[in-house]
């Protein structure tokens, strides 16, 4: 079902390169979380198993390597040589189905297992819809809907990227959407998080890092040091490139405590992925002003469950105060007349070199999105004094 090693989100490759350089012997475990309590039909696990096993045959083509060399100079030749030899190992993925319940777990060296999450979620979504009764809208309707959205954003003068790999309806729908965005978007469409589709449609791959980068640092170095060391190590690897920092792994308030003048000047901006976007924008603007930095020289990328209405409201609040860009996922790639799946695959445990397995957690700006061991979540809240903040 997947035809390219690059049918994945860009930040997985940028993180993989950083993990190889900083934590080559670390191990990781991930688990599927069925937030929407979806029921899985008989035979679902077997079909997913077949698709996962087939991923062992994927490899980086010569043309794909040249695309990365040309487009992403911060991915050094040593890493691209590694990626040329990389093959998925399906034995790292354990799939169990009992009745309508479905479980998936991943375990292995972090630099290897880091690539599984996004394609697995895309496969889960596509197989689930294919086996279900729901019928999607016709291609012409999807094309028209996508065109109308990007033309609306164009009239507002915005920068829009497509971030919809994980919960896409299918690869074919995803491909149609990116083609339509490319055709109608002009300068408004800044690129896609999906590296394969960015290459296929001649646009820029977009992304920096995800929550797991910070989650691992919390396990390895402690919650108080997690944000600052995650940022420091990112800078050590990329030397100022890939300069958008994700804020909400241990709450944005905790992040800004670590986002001192050095980081605030060095990073191009921050990404909002949970909580009230207007409150976040106001807090970000205030933080830059306290640092003596003109917020208009910095960028917030908004990427949390965006719709045209939400985007317009955020733009109205931020315009003239701070630069904005928007990463839109499910509203592009699964707005096809069905209910999108509500699921995630998250890192659950990490074993840094020379240490034992330990739980990793995420403390979102929305408590319902917290993930990880409940006791560890409570410990982190105490260590970070989050109860006193509330």
UniProtKB/Swiss-Prot annotation:
It holds the Pfam family NAPRTase. Catalyzes the synthesis of beta-nicotinate D-ribonucleotide from nicotinate and 5-phospho-D-ribose 1-phosphate at the expense of ATP. One of its GO terms (molecular function) is nicotinate phosphoribosyltransferase activity. Belongs to the NAPRTase family. The modification Phosphohistidine is found at residue 211. Keywords: Ligase, Phosphoprotein, Pyridine nucleotide biosynthesis. Transiently phosphorylated on a His residue during the reaction cycle. Phosphorylation strongly increases the affinity for substrates and increases the rate of nicotinate D-ribonucleotide production. Dephosphorylation regenerates the low-affinity form of the enzyme, leading to product release. It catalyses: nicotinate + 5-phospho-alpha-D-ribose 1-diphosphate + ATP + H2O = nicotinate beta-D-ribonucleotide + ADP + phosphate + diphosphate. One of its GO terms (cellular component) is cytosol. Its EC number is 6.3.4.21. Pathway: Cofactor biosynthesis; NAD(+) biosynthesis; nicotinate D-ribonucleotide from nicotinate: step 1/1. The gene is pncB. One of its GO terms (biological process) is NAD biosynthetic process via the salvage pathway. InterPro entries: N/Namide_PRibTrfase, NAPRTase_N, Nic_PRibTrfase, Nic_PRibTrfase-Fam, Nicotinate_pribotase-like_C. This is Nicotinate phosphoribosyltransferase. SUPFAM superfamilies: Nicotinate/Quinolinate PRTase C-terminal domain-like, Nicotinate/Quinolinate PRTase N-terminal domain-like.
